[in-house]
Amino acid sequence: MKKVYAGATRDRKEFRFHRNLFKDLMQHLQAYGLRTSNMDIVDKPPTEPLRVTFPVNEDVVPRDYQVGLIDFLGDFSLRTKVTNLQTGKGKTLSALMAMVKIGMRTAIQLRGGYVSRWIDDLEGLFSFKKGDILVIRGRDALLSLINMAKADDLQAKVIIITNKTLYKLFEEFEKDGSDNYYGIRPEELYDLLRAGLRIVDEVHEDYHLSFRTDIYSNVSSSIHLSATLDTEDVFRRQMYDIALPQQYWYKGVEYDKYIQSYAMFYATTSESLSKLKLSERGQDSYSHGAYEKSILRQKVLKDTYLEICRYPIQRFYIENDWQGGQKCIVFCYLVEFCVVLRDYLRGIYPELNIREFVAETDEKVLKEADIIVSTIKSAGTAQDIPDLKVSVLTQAVRKKEANIQTLGRLRKLKRWPNVTPVFVYLNNTSIETHTKYHEAKKEIFQGKVLSQREEHIPLRL
């Protein structure tokens, strides 16, 4: 399904384009004989936002390298601000300290799965009173928020709104126009809320929605957070350049290299290779899901592959001066395979707490487990895993953003400052696609890791 980076009502009486395309739109219309002298062009400034104070806890002190970023994000004269700060360097804290600097009611836009983490951060940084934070999830909750604002009964300083909730607002407006369920036009929302600042978390994940939020909102200032806005997708890069032009990116923090990367090679016998599926039925492109499914269907292959997956865990996590409290995460593709690998590892390491982390899993697993088995979709982005020493990527993945986000789960080990976090990815040298992905990773990780090493696993699939 194609995504259109514009908006229109179903009756086609209204069309919406990003404000940064205004000059291009005017030139386009004039090329078709439509003169600006025959147009009514209205520049509507946002309503005066509600000024508020945020009670910062006394022990909250930004790091030296965050000070310049906070000043940049807190510049209210800039309508759009972007930070592509690497994971673990405090994007959330920097954005919230900029919020303090701006001192206006703030709306935070994010995926529903990140709400609890943001609430934890807000409550850890500020001494909020009951009612200062409001979470809006679902159409009924949004309608209640709108009605509170209309009745001048809105007290919250921070309003958290999930992406899907905003999506429904835009969808229903495009279908029903002004006569919609919510009783407002989308561009009236921030004016009604008197929110002067919008913070968008992990903007790269639901970028189409974030783009559409821009064309359907009239907010004074926005802060966009991500660690992976660097993309090789040409079209996506063009869309980034429209809504998030490079001149609005903060580039004052040098990349901190503290991870050691290992490519772990293994090979497959010709007999086994003939039994492996490398693509889904009817498709030509490589599918790691098909690869794992074909392995799970054959006991000998499954047993060997499970041991291949265990090898880097034993090598870098268990044998490399393991200490209680240190964690390891393993990324697979299929949830089914996560469960199978979890059970296999439990049989070998009964003394360790080994858990899977997939959809609907409680986030406390990330804090309690010694070894976590997960997927890139579940734990590869925006998850903070304390004391993570080793990350093992079993899935062959090419996409630049996925590789950087997965690498970024590793943070400096505060409790063991002399221990270097290790990132391992498996690579089947008998499969051409895996080899190409390995070459791509070498380029992607250049300048982002201490060094890139290669080792061979003494097992054949």
Language-model regions: role of each:
Residues 41-82:
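Conserved pre-motif I regulatory segment
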Residues 87-126, 333-338:
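Conserved Walker A/P-loop ATP-binding site and its immediately adjacent core
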Residues 113-143, 344-352:
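Conserved helix-turn-beta segment of the N-terminal RecA-like "Helicase ATP-binding" lobe
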Residues 152-174, 367-381:
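Conserved two-lobed SF2 helicase motor
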Residues 194-197, 202-263:
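Post-DEXD/H (motif II) to motif III coupling segment of the RecA-like Helicase ATP-binding lobe
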Residues 281-330, 340-343:
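Conserved interdomain hinge at the start of the Helicase C-terminal
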Residues 324, 329-358:
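Conserved helicase motor "Helicase C" RecA-like lobe of SF1/SF2 P-loop NTPases
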Residues 355-444:
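Conserved RecA-like P-loop NTPase helicase motor core
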